[in-house]
Curated annotation (Swiss-Prot):
It holds the Pfam family Helicase_C. Gene3D superfamilies: P-loop containing nucleotide triphosphate hydrolases (3.40.50.300). ATP binds at residues 204-211. It is found in: Cytoplasm. The keyword Protein biosynthesis applies. This is ATP-dependent RNA helicase ded1. It catalyses: ATP + H2O = ADP + phosphate + H(+). It comes from Cryptococcus neoformans var. neoformans serotype D (strain JEC21 / ATCC MYA-565) (Filobasidiella neoformans). It comes from the Eukaryota. Residues 15-68, 560-598 are annotated as: Disordered. A motif (Q motif) lies at residues 160-188. Belongs to the DEAD box helicase family. DDX3/DED1 subfamily. SUPFAM superfamilies: P-loop containing nucleoside triphosphate hydrolases (SSF52540).
Length: 637
């Protein structure tokens, strides 16, 4: 008992310091939250503290008494985030020109071109024959024979090759990286027109290089003249928490997220090593991540109208610095009900007026309604038509097969088995359910297929498109979401499993093949449910010097057509097509007297359209556009 008391007394004496107070128990070491769930490392025996070390009276280490086992942050990196005690310091990289390889800058009024980045070059430009990037085809030289119509005052002379001027030397290098050898007809005319500061309304065949037609001259000007100084932001009272605005210099509006993503990728490709930072925003994706991406740079912005309006309302984007406004696929945006958003963006926000900016409109078709809209958006514009507006490419061999609905699957399998080109096959259907159903059917028959439609998430769509472009799934079943504007390389066969309700949609869908001078094939499944498109389809086949089946002529003649000037029909979507002559798809400059509508031109209208003839045109009594569905994320298709 006495021994126990002696041992206890000794233990108490050891825990008493010189001032007579007991030492407090040692607190456990602080563990950062991101390390708390990890398995504890083996306990290390701490080295003996030097004799001079003693805890300070406050219990905190002082510079003179800090244990040598604690990590000291070097002064050179003390400002950086080193992740807490014990973490390894991150040394911030510095670059010769102040920007990482692949990115340039603008300093002291000079364009500082960035260093080359081989990883970025492989990603953006690909390699010869990789299947992801399309080269010009065997019929590319035939583009020189395509008729070109230009109207307006003081039209600049076209260019015949990519040269400086009018193209900036930095852009010329990027054009070579992309293996572009000769400008297409629309580029030959649009490059000098835009470089001359003129507004432009351009109409060209699908796959004719419209995107390069506006990107090349805009980027050349930006490379040459540099960025504009953003206006001074007024203090909104939110302090450090207020949203940081971005001020794009060029704005490209397009109807669908796929198309704006494609334009953005082209912009990245040709803005390589420059000070210009392209950005993209669209509906159906996380808006927070898009806002963070905008903070990394937003000089050339590609956007869908709905998402752009959303970001303007949030105070993230200002249009005060816009010098170039591009409306791509303008007719499609109006068809999808985006006119209110477009008018708000152009007329009601802080975008400079029509006299202070340059406005360009590009599309495969320009009906009269679009040309009327252009009056308020463009000033003294030049009207450019390359080839017959709304026509199909002669590089496409068009076939029309009569097949009842119950036999379509069997004929589709026969076509796939007979396919010898080894290229990509695009199958168009009308509904989202049919896209998934037909894709499942093809997979069950041992065909590698994928699908894309409005109900798939953006991640799923991008994955499907990549699988298709790379050849892992060489068959893509798609709704109208992929019908307009998308540049899918190396499509050799387009199959219209379901025919659209008007010939303009037919033109755009088969235009996914036969691009950039390459040859392609289209096969349309036709039956008596498609007689409303029969007569126009015959005319289109004749124009492109294609074979017209006799059964198609007989079925089309069975349908009675009303109206004057050769008649007209009213399609199931309410579109009315008049007979007679003229540019049926609205391809002439309406400023010229007696232009493309003189002989009973085509007019579009939803609800209450009318059968044609004469020179009548305009919206039907129940017309107007369908309700604005916001962004392209709406499942209108």
């Amino acid at each position: 008992m006495a021994a126990t008391d002696v041992n206890g007394l000794a233990s108490q004496m050891n825990s008493v310091n010189l001032n007579g107070a007991s030492q407090k128990p040692q607190k456990p070491a602080y563990v950062p939250p991101h390390l708390r769930n990890r398995a504890a490392p083996p306990a290390a025996v701490p080295p003996a503290a030097p004799a001079a070390y003693r805890p300070s009276p406050t219990g905190l280490p002082t510079p003179a008494t800090t244990p040598p086992t604690r990590h000291i942050v070097p002064a050179a990196v003390a400002e950086d985030d080193v992740g807490g005690w014990g973490a390894q310091p991150r040394v911030r990289k510095t670059f010769e020109h102040g920007a990482p390889p692949g990115f340039g800058s603008w300093k002291n009024g000079q364009h500082v071109v960035g260093a080359r980045n081989t990883r970025m070059e492989k990603e953006m430009y690909g390699e010869v024959g990789d299947g992801l990037h399309q080269a010009t085809g065997i019929n590319f030289d035939k583009y020189a024979d395509i008729p070109v119509e230009v109207s307006g005052k003081g039209v600049p002379e076209p260019v015949t090759e990519f040269t400086n001027p009018p193209i900036n030397p930095v852009l010329l290098e990027n054009v070579k990286y992309a293996r572009y050898a000769t400008p297409t007809p629309v580029q030959k005319y649009s490059i000098p027109i835009v470089a001359d500061g003129r507004d432009l309304m351009a109409c060209a065949q699908t796959g004719s290089g419209k995107t390069g037609g506006f990107l090349f001259p805009i980027l050349s000007a930006l490379f040459t003249y540099g960025p504009s100084t953003p206006p001074v932001e007024q203090d909104t009272g939110y302090g450090y928490r207020r949203t940081k605005k971005v001020y794009p210099t060029a704005l490209v509006l397009a109807p669908t997220r796929e198309l704006v993503s494609q334009i953005h990728e082209e912009a990245r490709k040709f803005a390589y090593r420059s000070w210009v930072r392209p950005a993209v925003v669209y509906g159906g994706a996380d808006i927070g991540s898009q806002m963070r991406a905008l903070d990394r740079g937003c000089d050339l912005l590609s956007a869908t109208p709905g998402r752009l309006v959303d970001l303007i309302e949030r105070g993230k984007i200002s249009l005060a610095n816009v010098k170039y406004l591009v409306l791509d696929e303008a007719d499609r945006m109006l068809d999808m009900g985006f006119e209110p958003q477009i008018r708000r963006i152009v007329d009601e926000e802080d975008m400079p007026g029509v006299l202070e900016r340059q406005t360009l409109m590009f599309s495969a078709t320009f009906p009269r309604e679009i040309q009327n809209l252009a009056r308020s958006f463009l000033k003294e514009y030049i009207f450019l038509t390359v080839g017959r507006v709304g026509s199909t490419s002669e590089n496409i061999t068009q076939r029309v097969e009569y097949v009842d609905d119950q036999d379509k699957r069997s004929l589709l399998l026969d076509l796939l088995l007979a396919e010898q080109s080894g290229g990509l096959i695009l199958v168009f259907v009308e509904t989202k359910r049919m896209a998934d159903t037909l894709c499942d059917f093809l997979c069950s028959r041992r065909h590698n297929a994928t699908s894309i439609h409005g109900d798939r998430t953006q991640r799923e769509r991008e994955a499907a498109l990549y699988a298709f472009k790379s050849g892992r799934a060489p068959i893509l079943v798609a709704t109208a979401v992929a019908a307009r504007g998308l540049d899918i390389p190396n499509v050799t066969h387009v199959i219209l499993y379901d025919l659209p309700n008007d010939v303009a949609e037919y033109t755009h869908r088969i235009g996914r093949t036969g691009r950039a001078g390459n040859v392609g094939t289209s096969t349309a499944f036709f039956n008596r449910g498609n007689t409303n498109i029969g007569k126009d389809l015959i005319e289109l086949l004749k124009e492109a010097n294609q074979e017209v089946p006799q059964w198609l002529v007989e079925i089309s003649s069975e349908r009675s057509y009303g109206g004057g000037g050769g008649g007209g029909y009213k399609g199931s979507r309410g579109r009315s097509t008049g007979g007679g002559g003229g540019a049926r798809l609205g391809g002439r400059d309406m400023r010229q007297g007696g232009g493309g509508y003189g002989g009973g031109g085509r007019t579009s209208g939803y609800g209450g359209g009318y059968g044609g003839g004469g020179g009548g045109a305009g919206w039907g009594s129940g017309g107007g556009f369908p309700p604005a569905g916001g962004d392209s994320g709406a499942s209108w298709w």
